[in-house]
Amino acid sequence: MELLRRIRCSLPVAIALLCGGSLPAIAQTAQTTMRILTIGDLPYSEAEEDEMNTTLRRAIHGAEFPFVIHYGDLKGGGEACTDRLLTTRRNDIWNLHPGRVFYTPGDNEWTDCDRSSLTQRFSELERLNFLRQLFFSQPLDLPPEWDYQQQPLFPENARWRQGEILFLTLHIVGTNNGRHEILLDDPEMAIAQVEARDQANRVWLQTAFNDATQQPTRAIIITTQADLSNGHGEEACTPTNPTDCNGYVTIQKQLRTLAAQFEKPVLLIHGDTNPYCLDQGFGGTQAPNLWRLNAWGDFQNPADATQILIQPDDRHQPFVVQTLLHQQAPEGC
């Protein structure tokens, strides 16, 4: 019996029960499923900051997730994007799971930092450079089997593995992916950087699906900040029309095409908009295996995080979702 107690509790349920503890609300079984945690659009207030740094942090530390993904917007839109605030929030997020936090930027911490309503305004391009230095100048120190990679020149785009499940982040933000309300920077320069980032995202997405065909992969999990379903019209952005267009439609079409070719479960996780919902029809008839999770946050009350059970062998329900503290399941989108 003592020998069995030393066996990792991530083994099948019969052995897990011998380890002396109760199973969490969403259980993790070895090899066939895994459980991850996402958080974002948080904190937007002092109350949410306190909740994240106390109750949420304790719950995350006790749940033994392999990592945490923060899907951006780590501050409220009305807070000035100062070095001090961004550094404090970076430290708070890192402390949720030291050395195991993946973060993709949100519009609140760079594209929207030039708003006239703010007490202190910043160039959005300067804030993006600051974020890249603050969060991504040093790669995470992860085990080799995670196959962790960052995209050259766009280090916020990351890719890693857990067994046969592939994860990646794409730097796509609100404000029409940074194409609207360029108030303090040269618009042509800002749009040129948006175009470069868009191209990098498309390359990173294609590379991830290529990798999934070359290595055993049973599911792909993609995280962005932006709600790709919340675009402006249906017209794609072009060099001759870079702003009065839908900044998400091109990557959305690419994602559906790649997911359809992959055939196995694909989940897009994002924040940016308020509904807490799981969209089983996001891929449409073209890619019924493509799901979309608008995760908890964006003034949802109370402050919480979203845990996801990934069970790729269940084609009808490959993703089971509920909040960490209150076990609230999402509605349909």
Regions picked out by a protein language model, each given a short descriptive name:
Residues 27-85:
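N-terminal active-site segment of His-dependent metallophosphoesterases
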Residues 49-57, 83-91, 128, 132, ...:
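Extracytoplasmic/secreted envelope proteins and their assembly/folding machinery
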Residues 80, 85-200, 283-312:
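Extended active-site neighborhood of metal-dependent phosphoesterases/phosphodiesterases
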Residues 58-67, 95, 168, 184-281:
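His/acidic metal-ligating clusters that form di-metal
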Residues 35-39, 66-76, 100-105, 109-112, ...:
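Structural recognition of the beta-strand scaffold that forms the well-ordered cores
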Residues 10-22:
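Bacterial N-terminal signal peptides
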Residues 311-333:
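A short C-terminal boundary segment appended to hydrolase-like catalytic domains
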Residues 2-11:
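Bacterial N-terminal signal peptides that target proteins for export
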